[in-house]
Amino acid sequence: IGMGLIGLLTAQMLKANGCQVIGVDLDQSKLDLAKTWGIIPFNPKSDGDVVKFVENYTNGIGCDGVIITASAKTDEIISQAARMSRKRGRIILVGVVGLNISRAEFYEKELTFQVSCSYGPGRYDENYEQRGQDYPLSFVRWTEKRNFEAILNAIAAGNLKVKEMITEVVGIEDYQKIYGSIGSSKSIASILKYNEIQRNFEVNVTINPYIKAAAKANIGIIGAG
C-alpha cells in the first residue's frame, strides 16, 4: 500500500523474488509505472474496494503479507491491511499511518504486525555504525550493511530499476523546489545536482628518517630449556 519511491522499490524486490504483487495507490501515474514491471495496479479512486479486489484475486484467501509504505494520518489504511490479509498473515509498516488498530480484525485472523526499523539490524547501534562492530553472519544474516549490498547487487543485475523513477534533476541552489512541495509533489525521486568546483589538492608524504642498524646484534632468549 503506497507506490511512492519506497513502495516501488519494495514491490520490485518482491516481484524479483517470485511474489505476485498488488500495488495500491491514488496516483495513477505511479501505478502505470509499476504496471510496466509486472505489478498489478489498483487505484481505489477508480477501481473501487481494494479489499474485495484482493479477496477475488486470491480466491477468497487474502494476502500472505501486506507492506505499508504510505504516509497518511488515517487509520483506514491499517484496517484495510488487516481485512485484505489471510488468516495468520503478516503486516509490515514501513511508512507512517494512523495506528488506532481494531483488536477484532487482528484477533480473528491472528495477524502479525511489525514496524520496520529503517535499514535493518545495526541501525541506531553506535557500536555497529560508528565503531564497525559487525554482527556474525551465521546469527544475523541480513544486517544494515548486507541489506545495502543486496540492493546494490540487485541494481547491478538489472532486477531493480531505479533510473525510471528519477522524475526530476534540480540544482542545489533550487532545493526549495523539492523540499517546499515534498508533500504534494507528483515526483517520485529527485536528484540534487551540485555545481562542479575545480580544486587543487596537495598531498603531503612524511618520510621517516633512515635509522642505521646497530653494528653489534643483541639477542634476547626467553625460556631456559
Report residues per predicted region.
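C-terminal substrate-binding/catalytic core of Rossmann-like NAD(P)-dependent dehydrogenases/reductases
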Residues: 101-164
